[in-house]
Amino acid sequence: GYYNYKMSIGDLRVGTSFRQYRPNSKGTIFNDEFEKITNNQFGFYSGIESKIYNEILTINSTIRIDKNENYDYSISPAASIVISPNESDYIRLSFSSGVRNPTLSEQYLYYNAGRAILVGNLNGHGEDYGENLVTINSLINYFKPVVPNKDSLVFFSIDPIRPEKVRTLEIGYRGTVEDILYLDLSYYYSLYKDFIGYRVGAKFNANDTIVNGVVGYDLNARSIEIHRMSANSENNVSTHGASIGMNLYLNNYLINGNYSLNILNKKNTDDPIIPAYNTPKHKFNIGFSARELKFKNIKGISFNINYKWVDKFNFVGSPQFTGIVDRYSTVDAQLSKSFEKINTTIKFGASNIFDNKHYQVYGGPLIGRLTYVSLAYDL
């Protein structure tokens, strides 16, 4: 919960939260077959908002402190400035920081998905933690020659998963032009440290051998298991993007649209992490709607039509659910009629009206047309 306090310098808000997780999968999803998992986390929040210069300038500053029992305290400050020279225009500049503690899955997961075993990473993996862990390509190269060569194997280690940290700068404008055009523009840049994603490798049992004075390597092929492990990026990862929103009001008609650009930057690094960004680079919507139209003796007619386009993107899930989600577009439409005397509205509509079957996540179900009829009565 939280509380608000009125002060001479502004409005102060303080709050706190506590959450306890107690999963019980009996070893089917989490590593809790022999030992129960309990995970506690809590946080404290405080912020103050001040308005000065006849409320032309609004300054907001906050700080948040979080603690997960498996990690140290984390502090997340943030601040923003909003300039409103008049009642219809707002310019905003903000800096924010945040910490994302690893989820239960990223800490405790142990699930055999067939092609790979999906595991969390509370204690680390690999050579530094007493395990044989190699890259998939090097394991393939190991078995290519008639006499396998241990030197072909590339061993590596993954440190225990750490909280993901992000710092974001944003600038934006929101306002109206001639009372008919509403605009919302923004640009952001985010820098991630310890970005959480996944790494894939092979684990196996093996022993060094000496036969007739010759040193060898006995790799038990039957013990090979492919693991997908939660991991942090070795390099900083940045994202940036922009969004544009517009509403054009023409009497009872409205034309609206929005566009967003989101870019993940992993170039010029040799970081092996697989980032679970799962966000299309380009996405936009265009809509046309009307309210309470009148046609001769018929009134209370409303409608809306919306076109959505989403660019293709790489979706990262479990190994069998990782791949490209193709670009897709849909058209939604709705027609409604209100009956004032009986306080009732009837609506007919369809999402994806042209039945353009598409995936929104890799490995997910195909999504097609959905039609509906609704009757609403106002009490």
Located regions from the model:
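Conserved C-terminal beta-signal and adjacent last beta-strands/turns
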Residues: 92-96, 254-261, 273-379
